[in-house]
């Protein structure tokens, strides 16, 4: 099999500190009663990590490359808007998304109550299966101190042509 026909894998990471004066958006869902995250857009670490993984897999760089903070049209942009545009870029580059997995890292909020809802939204937005999981750091580091959230994602794309 030639390299042009092989699937490609990307890894994405995103980290944001909490910002109590902002709403919390995670995996495209609003989380009322939880402190938000600081960032140029909505700071949805789950979607940002997923976008980074998809862009990496397609050889398109990362969120900063595609939607930099110098671009005013992306200020306060919804993560779902960034994800939709990322999927378009991946497809325009000649790839189809096979699947992806994202793990949220932090002490709160607890993902379990809304995991299925989040997976459905992400899967519909991407047009491919997206698995979502979460883990704590058992009180270690900035995540354990509840200073912010992080997410790590992997994505598989394959040539669509």
Curated annotation (Swiss-Prot):
The keyword Magnesium does not apply. GO terms for molecular function: 2-C-methyl-D-erythritol 2,4-cyclodiphosphate synthase activity; metal ion binding. It catalyses: 4-CDP-2-C-methyl-D-erythritol 2-phosphate = 2-C-methyl-D-erythritol 2,4-cyclic diphosphate + CMP. The record marks 40, 136 as: Transition state stabilizer. Keywords: Isoprene biosynthesis, Lyase, Metal-binding. InterPro entries: MECDP_synthase, MECDP_synthase_CS, MECDP_synthase_sf. PANTHER family: 2-C-METHYL-D-ERYTHRITOL 2,4-CYCLODIPHOSPHATE SYNTHASE, CHLOROPLASTIC. This is 2-C-methyl-D-erythritol 2,4-cyclodiphosphate synthase. The gene is ispF.
